[in-house]
Structures are given as structure tokens and as C-alpha cells.
């Protein structure tokens, strides 16, 4: 909007009306949660749409399964788009997105790399101890969009915003993830949703990926 673009607001969302608006306005950018993309794959109103207008499609707000991404990428190609879904990540505590899959390189299961002015690290849950590349832990981030505080909630603020040994103040997101050696971030799950069984950490998103990879399973949750 600040650069002269138009933002199309939808008073009440339905997959059918959303599909019709895409065909009518031919937007360049679409951002949504995974359930939006799943819904668009199912509605007949999107059939025959020319999506060559799209320059970017962004997914966030929840885990995008590998299977759904493959299906929607194929859908985009079939409808004339030359792009694929790019995953991103953000939290309320940093205002908006702070991590995005670059257009020139994508890695399966990754939510991308931090914005240029934002830094990420992965720490052992419940500590400030940074873990090695490839090891899972809590996602922490810092940057210019970091919140000041939870208003009138100093204890919650102190738990979320912590000053580490490097002198920087970091937001502890409560999300599990990892970072590879190229700086790509992988979101796993909210820490509270992790299942521990027989000493192993099991994440619902991993189970969903396995289930949705079966030819007879359309959607799992």
C-alpha cells in the first residue's frame, strides 16, 4: 500500500467468493494460511482461472505440509503461474513476518531465511544455550520490529524477552525448529504440542506429512 499498491479486503471469507475475487481482480500477491490453499483446490469457481498474474504466493500462520505444497504448486503451474508457494514465519511479538523463503532457492520443509535486519538462533528449550546447526530447539529472534512489552504483564514480558550473553535481547517464541548450515529455518511445532513417547519427540506435523503422503488420505489434522 505504501508503494502505491491496492489491498483487496474481504468482509466475509468463503472459498467460493475468494476464488471469484482472484478471477476478477487478478492480484499479483496472495498471502494465506494452509487451509486457504486447501480450500482453493476444492472449489469449482477457480476452474479455468488464469493465474499468470501472480508474482508471489505466501503461506504462513501454520505448518504447510509437503504434500499440500506440492499439490498447490502443481495447481499454480496448471493455471499459468510461473511461481511456487513460498513459506514464511512471523509472530505477533515481532509485528509481522520475519523469515521468508527466498525466490531463488527453496528447501523442502523450510520456512526460509531471516530478513536482512533480523537474526535467528535456536536454543535448548528453557535456556539461552544455543544448539548446533541441525539440532532442534526453541526458535529465538531479534530485530527492529520486536515488541516493547506485553502491556501490564511484566512477568510474561520477562519470560518472552530475554537478554542473552551476546548483549542482544531475544524473543523466545515458544516454537520448536532448527537451523541448517546455510541459515535456513525449519519450523516444527509449538513446544506445547510436542508429544513425547518412549523417549522420542514426535510432532503432529510430521505425522500429518506421513498420513497425507498416502494415496487414500486427502487431508489430516
What are these regions (language model features)?
Residues 59-62, 89, 142-144, 198-200:
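Glycine-rich beta-strand-to-loop/alpha-helix junction loops that act as flexible
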Residues 113-117, 129-162, 200-202:
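Conserved ATP/PPi-binding loop(s) of AMP-dependent carboxylate-activating enzymes
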Residues 30, 143, 148-149, 168, ...:
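AMP-binding/adenylate-forming catalytic core of the ANL superfamily
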Residues 120-122, 161, 175-179:
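A structural signal for short hydrophobic beta-strand segments in well-ordered beta-sheet cores
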Residues 5-25, 34-36, 202-207:
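ATP-dependent adenylate-forming carboxylate-activation enzymes
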Residues 43, 154, 214-215:
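Acidic-histidine catalytic/liganding microenvironments
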Amino acid at each position: 500500500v505504501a508503494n502505491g499498491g491496492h489491498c483487496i479486503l474481504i468482509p466475509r471469507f468463503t472459498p467460493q467468493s475468494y476464488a471469484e475475487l482472484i478471477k476478477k481482480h487478478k492480484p499479483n500477491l496472495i498471502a494465506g494460511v494452509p487451509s486457504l490453499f486447501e480450500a482453493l483446490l476444492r472449489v469449482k469457481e477457480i476452474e479455468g482461472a488464469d493465474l499468470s498474474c501472480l508474482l508471489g504466493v505466501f503461506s504462513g500462520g501454520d505448518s504447510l505440509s509437503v504434500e499440500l505444497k506440492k499439490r498447490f504448486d502443481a495447481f499454480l503451474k496448471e493455471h499459468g503461474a510461473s511461481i511456487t508457494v513460498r513459506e514464511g514465519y512471523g509472530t505477533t511479538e515481532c509485528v509481522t513476518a520475519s523469515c521468508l523463503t527466498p525466490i531463488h532457492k527453496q528447501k523442502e520443509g523450510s520456512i526460509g531465511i531471516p530478513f536482512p535486519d533480523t537474526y535467528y538462533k535456536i536454543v535448548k528449550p528453557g535456556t539461552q544455550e544455543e544448539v548446533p546447526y541441525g539440532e532442534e530447539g526453541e526458535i529465538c529472534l531479534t530485530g527492529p520490529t520486536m515488541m516493547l512489552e506485553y502491556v501490564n504483564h511484566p512477568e510474561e514480558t520477562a519470560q518472552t524477552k530475554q537478554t542473552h550473553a551476546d548483549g542482544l535481547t531475544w524473543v523466545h517464541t515458544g516454537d520448536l525448529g532448527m537451523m541448517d548450515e546455510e541459515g535456513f529455518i525449519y519450523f516444527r511445532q509449538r513446544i506445547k504440542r510436542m508429544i513425547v513417547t518412549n523417549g522420542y519427540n514426535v510432532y503432529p506435523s510430521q505425522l500429518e506429512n506421513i498420513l497425507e503422503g498416502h494415496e487414500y488420505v486427502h487431508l489430516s489434522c
